[in-house]
Each structure stands twice: as structure tokens, then as C-alpha cells.
Amino acid sequence: MTSEPSLAPDFQVSAWLNAPEPPSLAALRGRVVVALAFQMLCPGCVQYALPQLLRVRRAFHAYRVATLALHTVFEHHAANSRATLEAFAHEYRLDAPIGIDAPDPVGGPIPRTMAAYAMQGTP
């Protein structure tokens, strides 16, 4: 027995970088969306996942394939500030929209989108 497909929940972010307007999955409906959850202190994210996202971004026309990045902070919270992420994005030439995952409303370590998607880590 298969269940009915469901729509992916929108990202719950505190801010977006590289986006003149906050992107939403509802607005991108009908297009392929490649989304990457990463943390800038994750070696696998920096070495493999982010370069792959940039390759996808450059290989496909933006009207057909949307690329989004989600910065999920589930550890080392003090080192993962917005200012540090902005410098990181500039240094690594990340031009895709980057959402900063909203923190847990009750102060837990797992941010909201990461929890909504039941992610266990990055990349």
C-alpha cells in the first residue's frame, strides 16, 4: 500500500542571503528544486556538497532548476553567526539563495526546518 504524496514543507528560516525576495517552495512549484542542507563547519559540506550544488546551479537554467541552500546550525552555535556565514558565502562564491534555518522555539539544538524534514545531520 502506498500513501498519497505530500508536499515538502516550506523552509522555516530566520533570514535569506543572496535572495532579493525570500524564496518559497510554493512559488517554485512546477520546477525542479535542488535543496542542500549544510553547515559551514562541516568538512564534507565544504569539500563535496557545496561544490556539487554550484555545479548544478551552473549546468541548468534557473527557470527550470532552482537551487537553494539551507544553513542548519545544530552544533557550535556561537561560531555559526550570520556575519560568519556571509563571509563564508563570499569566500566560497556561493551565489545560490541561502536560508538560515530558524532556531528551535523552545531552545533545543535542532533548528526548525531540520526537524521538519527529520534530518539527522549534514550534508
List each language-model region with its residue ranges.
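Residues that form or immediately flank small-molecule/cofactor binding pockets and catalytic motifs
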Residues: 16-18, 30, 72, 103-104
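N-terminal "domain-start" segment that seeds a small globular fold
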Residues: 1-26, 96
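Structural microenvironment flanking redox-active thiols in thiol-disulfide oxidoreductases
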Residues: 46-92, 103-110
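Short, flexible, glycine/charge-rich loop motifs used to bind or transfer phosphoryl groups or to couple energy/partner
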Residues: 1-2, 22-25, 56-58, 87, ...
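Thiol/disulfide oxidoreductase modules built on the thioredoxin-like
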Residues: 92-94, 100-123
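Proline-centered helix-kink/hinge sites
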Residues: 9, 43-44, 51, 97, ...
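Short active-site neighborhood of thiol/selenol oxidoreductases, capturing the structured segment around
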Residues: 22-53, 67-68
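Loop/turn elements at helix/coil->beta-strand transitions in domains of secreted/extracellular proteins
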Residues: 30-33, 63-66, 93-97, 121-122
